[in-house]
Amino acid sequence: MKAETTYMKTLGKVEAKLSRMKEQAAAVRWFYENGNLPESYNRALRLEELSEQTVLLTRVLPAYTGAAGATAQTDAIISNTIPVEVGFTAEGWFSVRIPALLPKKASGSADYIRSYLYPAMRKFFEGKPPVRFRDCVLAYRHVYDRSRPERAMRDHDNIETNMVTDILALYVLPDDHPAVCSHYYCSAAGSEDRTEVYVIPKHDFPMWMVEEKTLPDKGVKLYEVRFC
């Protein structure tokens, strides 16, 4: 059967990736223990890249069995593992909180983001009327673990934000054309890594800029419905 062939081919790719991850993990340790931290760092980056690629493969593996409900069960696992928070602030701004920094632009990074953000957005808006912000600012706030200050200097142009913007546009924007939505990027220190995204009417953006300096460490309370 075709489904079985695809299933086994994908499983083979997973096994190959795991083998390469094991090799890279050994290299990370070897270079570190032999005093070559720069090369250990390079190998660690490669290990992380292989890990992301492996995750993408394992996420589609259950569906290739043809089992009913495989996609829904996989989405539930993703939701529990990467608990994305979605809602409206007290001011009426739409917000998404992702419990990680967004990855750099690379092969597979957009698919990785789509795999956890799209199900979270779909679930939040299920049964709710559409919301469309016009003439707004899309603000990306990269919150980095203060124990890792080197992450403060992020190259915002090299971060995979396009997929996030595209998914948000499906639910809260007419589209992401510059005439509709401007973009703003900033970084802040926190107790742990996360990404906060806000959709703010332009006339409210000066207010958000002031409030951004004193946002609580865990983020503001988000509501199921928009009050404003």
Task: Locate predicted features.
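N-terminal targeting/trafficking signals and adjacent low-complexity tails
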Residues: 1-75, 81-83, 89-93
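Amphipathic alpha-helical interaction surfaces
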Residues: 60-63, 127, 167-171
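Short amphipathic
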Residues: 83-102, 139-144
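Short glycine/proline-enriched loop/turn "hinge" motifs that connect secondary-structure elements
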Residues: 86-90, 129-134, 189
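Long, charged, low-complexity intrinsically disordered regions
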Residues: 91-93, 107-110
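An N-terminal amphipathic alpha-helical segment
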Residues: 111-139, 146-148
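Short, hydrophobic/π-rich interface segment
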Residues: 145-187
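C-terminal edge-of-domain segments
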Residues: 177-225
